[in-house]
Amino acid sequence: MSIMSTVTALILAGFAAYVGAWYLNIGGIEGNFALLLFLATAVTGAYWVAERLYFLPRRRQAAQAIEAAQQQRRDELTRMGIQQVDGDVEDAKGKLLMQPWWLDWTAGLFPVIAAVFVLRSFLFEPFKIPSGSMIPTLLVGDLILVNKFTYGIRLPVINKKITEGNAPQRGDVMVFRYPPKPSLDYIKRVVGVPGDEVAYLNKRLTINGQAVATSALPDFFDEDAVRYFKQFEEQLGAHPHRLLNDPDRPAFVPGVDNFPFKDQCQYSIEGVRCKVPAGHYFMMGDNRDNSLDSRYWGFVPDSNIVGKAFFVWMNFGNLKRIGSFN
C-alpha cells in the first residue's frame, strides 16, 4: 500500500503543479480545462474500478479473517470455561475497512468528477463574460450557461461532432474557439451563415443585399466607460436584440489579420463585405465599435463551435441580470 500512496501523491502533485502553472502563467503554459477534467475522470475512474474489484475485497477478506480468528479464540476460551473475552474486534474491523487517504482522494471523488465531466462535456457548460464586446446583451461579469448539444454533441478535448443537431442560425449567441488561438473561447453573435453575403458598411448591416431592420432605442449608459452610447434594436433571425454604436468611431476596419478565405472579403473606407464560405460563420459582437470579431480575424469554422449561449445564471454585482436573453 505504501507504493500506491507514493504513486497517488505524485499524480496529485502533477495535477496541482499543472493547475498552479496555468493559473500563474508560468512558462507560458496554456491550460486546457477540458483535457484536465478528462484526465481527472480517467484517473479517478481507474482507482474507483480498482477499489471495487481489488482493494475493497482484500480489506473485507482481512476483516473477515480477524473476525474468524476472534471467534475461534472465543470458542477455545469457552471450552476452557472462560466466558469473558478481552479485545474489541469491531474497532479493528472498522479500521481495516476504512479507505486509505489515497483512495479517498481518487476513487472517492470519481462519482462527482464523472458527473461534472458528463454535464460539462455533453449538456451545459458555464462561462464568464470577460469583456464588453457583447454589451448590452451580456455585461462583464455575467456568468452564463452554454447549451452543448443544440448544434450537435461533440467529443470532449478533440471537439469532434458525433451527432448533427441543429445548424447555427443568424442571431444566435454562440461560444466558439477563437480561430487564431483555439485554446481561447470567444462569444459573439452569428451574423452570417454559410453562403451568406454579409456587408457592414457605414455601420449598417445587410445580409444578401437586404438591410437588416433596426430601430432606435434610448441611449445606453455604460457604467464601466462612464458614458452614453447610441442604442438600437436589430431584427436578425427570429428574435430582436439590442446593439450599440459609437458615432465617434469610424466605419473603417483597422488592423485586419491575414486569415483563411480572406479573399472572400473586400475592405473599404466604409467597412467590409464578405462571402461566408461553406462550413463557416461570420460573427460580430453587439457592441459593434468595441468588438474584435470576424471583421478582423475572419470566419469561424464549424469545428470550432462550442455551443449556444442562452442563460445568465449569476452576476454577483447585479442579481437582476439572472435570466434568459436573445
Regions found by a protein language model. Give the residues of each.
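Hydrophobic membrane-insertion alpha-helices, especially the h-region
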Residues: 108-122
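PDZ/PDZ-like domain segments forming the peptide/carboxylate-binding groove
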Residues: 108-109, 127, 136
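Aromatic-capped interface at the extracytoplasmic side
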Residues: 121-132
